[in-house]
Amino acid sequence: MIKRRDFVKQLAITGIGTGLMANPVSQLKLMSSGNQKEIKLGVIGLAVHSAAFSTFLNDKDKKDDLAGCRIEALYHPPGNPDVEFTIKQLAEFKSTVETAGVKIVSSVDELLSMVDGVLIETNDGRPHMEQVLPVLKAGKPVFVDKPVAEDLSGVIRIYNAAAEYNVPIFSSSSLRYGSRPQEINKTKKNQVLGADTYSPASLEPSHTDLYWYGIHGVEMLYTVMGTGCQEVWQIGHSKGVDVLTGVWENDRVGIFRGIREGKRDYGGTVFMNDDIVELGSFEGYRPLVVKIVEFFTTGQSPVSKDETLEIYAFMTAANISKLKGGKRVSVTELKKEFGINT
């Protein structure tokens, strides 16, 4: 099983249109049908995912499930110095995307003039609203990588803006699309009694705790449990770990462990009526890239707005619980407070 950090290391070593304003969804479908040209995508932000996605999508020998899209151009805006990649890392990412045939451009406007859809890949959630708004105003569907924003209000503003401009938006962790989480999600979710998941959970002070990295394990939890978490409490928080418990409808229980000390990996266990299933670890970025292609070619997000907003509300409630010494926090009430439909 490939390790996520090993994939990133290997990637670094190997170097591996306009006119959509009226109806971006129908026009993308038209462009991706029959013998039409591939949908041209633009990327905002040099990052690990920019390099990986460019390598997959611009591979001349890619399989049919990646057909329909290619990355045409990339713009890298100045980043906040507290979370920006090193000069060496940025140079490696730039080399990889250019090797894949991606043109580096000097502005968002230049990028938007060249592409049909956009991926926001800056690793910092704080500037995402500023970066995504011109894309939405141009009517171009957008994938926003995690974290969508630095806090729940920011996440909601971005999704509300997408709704205002009637533009498709999609966000997801790659861990959602592991083979075992997907098998349970598609065929056995109604049998799930509860689940435990874990992932690395490094913290970034400018972001709500789990938004920065713990979201990977939280999204695995939601993939198998579904929406409907009613309350959450953080039963443990230290330098090395976060442990939190959520209660779903029908008294189903989900537990997430965020790891900062010791061996860092991804995984979990799902408890069902007649089986106990191990979820497995990180399987690479390709399964997510397949879903990104699906999104841009159909105009339909594989993950609903309601589920994405609840995931971020869940992580926000966990943070509130931590600040209150581990008290239970109602996810349902928090969603109402922030105007998230329940």
Where would I find each of the regions flagged by the language model?
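Short helix/strand-capping hinge loops at secondary-structure junctions
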Residues: 139-141, 146-147
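Aromatic/hydrophobic pocket-lining residues that form π-stacking "cages" and hydrophobic walls in ligand
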Residues: 131, 158, 317
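C-terminal active-site/capping subdomain that shapes the small-molecule cofactor and substrate pocket
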Residues: 267-342
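A contiguous active-site-proximal alpha/beta segment in oxidoreductase catalytic domains
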Residues: 148-207
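A general structural signal for well-ordered alpha-helical segments in protein cores
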Residues: 50, 181, 217-218, 285, ...
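N-terminal glycine-/serine-/threonine-rich beta1-alpha1-beta2 phosphate-ribose binding loop
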Residues: 2-138, 163-164, 237, 324, ...
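Hydrophobic residues in well-ordered beta-strands that form the structural core
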Residues: 106, 144, 169-171
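Rossmann-like dinucleotide-binding domain that binds NAD(P)(H)
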Residues: 195-263, 306-309
